[in-house]
Amino acid sequence: MSDLISALLLGILEGLTEFLPISSTGHLLIAEQWLGRRSDFFNIVIQAGAILAICLALRQRLWSLATGLGERANRDYVLKVGVAFLVTAVVGLIVRKAGWQLPETLQPVAWALLIGGVWMLVAEHFAGKLPERDVVTWKVAIAVGLAQVVAGVFPGTSRSASTIFIAMLLGLSKRSAAADFVFMVGIPTMFAASGYALLEMYKEGGFGTENWTDVAVAFVAATITGFVVVKWLLGYIKKHRFTVFAVYRMLLGAALLLWLPAAAG
């Protein structure tokens, strides 16, 4: 398979999985086993495509918040987004300075996918018993910030899965409201993570030797696919539960756990 096709597929995969509760990092680590490992710079660029996608998909909501800061409800919402982001940033930096690294094997990813699927089913079951609420509390904001760090530390967990369901269990029980808040928090989080990673790469001597055509194709693919996925998901969860994603995660995790010993042998 050519490097260009590989880059295209990885870009599409990033766009498909970044916002669905199935773990983009986990899927990219799995895909790299067959499509080849790419540089950190390449991975940052395709995540930038996902960032652009969500900004475009939520542009009306972002504009409404920006122009409506005179209203107390909007100021309160933006402040809680900021607090969730700051919690992620501070705790995430502590974890990073402690020497955390992505796993080099797929077994932790497989377990995270499997356990995360079970978590989704259990969490939605209990959240479904709560009265439907769409108000973001400070407790929810702080918990979402912490959940983002957990998702970053354990690839396969999924940022959207961990954050949406912790928000629902803590009182933001309306699925669409939980997803809206989580996606809003994700925008500064992904911007900051990508910027920090680029700065670290620059300090270490540059951005590698990636083919710029491959990078551009992957970026565009991630942007287009991510935009479509966000718009679709926000409509889907208004009428449906996350069950299909939970089942997919459990099947994929179980399949990986069965395949890994055979592949090693």
Curated annotation (Swiss-Prot):
- GO annotation, biological process: cell wall organization; peptidoglycan biosynthetic process; regulation of cell shape; response to antibiotic
A single Pfam family, by name?
A: BacA
Q: What is its main location?
A: membrane
Write one Gene Ontology MF term: undecaprenyl-diphosphatase activity
This entry carries the following GO cellular component terms, namely: plasma membrane
Q: Which domain of life is it from?
A: Bacteria
Keyword entries, A-Z: Antibiotic resistance, Cell inner membrane, Cell membrane, Cell shape, Cell wall biogenesis/degradation, Hydrolase, Membrane, Peptidoglycan synthesis, Transmembrane, Transmembrane helix
Where is this chain's protein located in or outside the cell? Cell inner membrane
- Give the residue spans that cross the bilayer: 38-58, 75-95, 108-128, 135-155, 181-201, 215-235, 244-264
Does this UniProt record's set of keywords contain Phosphoprotein? no
Matching entries from InterPro entries are given as: UppP
Q: Does the keyword Hydrolase apply?
A: yes
Q: What is its EC number?
A: 3.6.1.27
Per UniProt, what is the membrane topology?
Multi-pass membrane protein
- Signal peptide interval: none
Top enzyme class, one word, equals hydrolase
Family assignment?
Belongs to the UppP family.
HAMAP family (UniProt xref):
Undec_diphosphatase (MF_01006)
The UniProt record's further free-text remark is: Bacitracin is thought to be involved in the inhibition of peptidoglycan synthesis by sequestering undecaprenyl diphosphate, thereby reducing the pool of lipid carrier available.
Q: What does this protein do?
A: Catalyzes the dephosphorylation of undecaprenyl diphosphate (UPP). Confers resistance to bacitracin.
Under NCBIfam families, the record lists:
PRK00281.1-4
**Name of the featured protein:** Undecaprenyl-diphosphatase
What organism, scientifically named, is this protein from?
Answer: Xanthomonas euvesicatoria pv. vesicatoria (strain 85-10) (Xanthomonas campestris pv. vesicatoria)
